[in-house]
Amino acid sequence: MSELRFVHMGFGAEAVEYQAAWDEQRRVHAARFLDEVPDTCLLLEHPPVYTAGRRTADNERPLDGTPVVDVDRGGKITWHGPGQLVGYPIQKLPRPVDVVAHLRRLEEVMIRVCAEFGVATSRVEGRAGVWVLGDPVEQRPSLGGLSLDFDPRLADDEFDPRLNGPEYAPSNAGQRREDRKICAMGIRVAKGVTMHGFALNVNPDTSSFDKIIPCGIRDAGVTSLAYELGREVTIGEVLPVAEKHLRDVLENADLKPREVERASA
């Protein structure tokens, strides 16, 4: 992959309104498709805003009628605001496009960023984003009888069977206390070029998530670097670390197209 260009759109008092950032994403996306610009990652903070992906249900929106911006990414509803580092990597991918591989690369970036700050995180089977796993729950005694619910996860609308493998922690079916999402992700690929990306909770006011069902997941919580570390953490601290790992993972990614099995005659 070509060298990754970073654009700092605005932080703190210069946080960027969501619509303005979305317009800039689309402008850069069109330019990247035409090879007028290199692969680019927009980095910024947003003023407080709720955004809803294509699969957001009405009952997952704020109950008090707080305005929501409907966007063309995958996933469901989330919140952006001060204290959250948002990144929009706009990259050209080979065809056939492997959306899950792109998502895994972004997750790997954020896992490394959190690790550098001393916070252990993981992927969770069936769920996008980066998570702090809940503590194990004490083994409960069996009540006897036959359970025919062999895999309750498959009945969960938010369980994505593509998100699995040895790099994923097992989906939490009661064996851990509440998992906590530290980095949300939602992406879109159009014309072979990526849009949208990640939102890492550095030091936000997480009470804003209380008005919604974040990412449509009812049995998990939200956390931040500051909460997990028990100290103040700033966007300025995290920004160079994020850029380092974005470069390391995305610039060195093996972007060979997947091998596609030929149809038999």
From Swiss-Prot:
Note: In the reaction, the free carboxyl group of octanoic acid is attached via an amide linkage to the epsilon-amino group of a specific lysine residue of lipoyl domains of lipoate-dependent enzymes.
Reactions that this protein is recorded to catalyse: octanoyl-[ACP] + L-lysyl-[protein] = N(6)-octanoyl-L-lysyl-[protein] + holo-[ACP] + H(+)
UniProt key word tRNA processing: no
Residue(s) at site: Lowers pKa of active site Cys: K181
PROSITE patterns for the chain: BPL_LPL_CATALYTIC (PS51733), LIPB (PS01313)
NCBIfam families membership: PRK14345.1
Pathway involvement of the protein, from the record: Protein modification; protein lipoylation via endogenous pathway; protein N(6)-(lipoyl)lysine from octanoyl-[acyl-carrier-protein]: step 1/2
Residues at the catalytic site: C215 (acyl-thioester intermediate)
Species of provenance: Streptomyces avermitilis (strain ATCC 31267 / DSM 46492 / JCM 5070 / NBRC 14893 / NCIMB 12804 / NRRL 8165 / MA-4680)
CDD domains named among the record's database cross-references: LipB
HAMAP family in alphabetical order: LipB (MF_00013)
Domain BPL/LPL catalytic, first and last residues per copy: 35-254
Protein name in the entry: Octanoyltransferase
Keyword annotations of the record: Acyltransferase, Cytoplasm, Transferase
Ligand binding (substrate): R73, G74, G75, K76, I77, T78, W79, H80, A184, M185, G186, G197, F198, A199
Record's subcellular location: Cytoplasm
Family according to the record: Belongs to the LipB family.
A GO-annotated cellular component: cytoplasm
GO biological process entries: protein modification process
Principal location listed in the UniProt entry: cytoplasm
Pfam families found in the cross-reference section: LplA-B_cat
Alphabetized InterPro entries for the sequence: aa-tRNA-synth_II/BPL/LPL (IPR045864), BPL_LPL_catalytic (IPR004143), Octanoyltransferase (IPR000544), Octanoyltransferase_CS (IPR020605)
Function: Catalyzes the transfer of endogenously produced octanoic acid from octanoyl-acyl-carrier-protein onto the lipoyl domains of lipoate-dependent enzymes. Lipoyl-ACP can also act as a substrate although octanoyl-ACP is likely to be the physiological substrate.
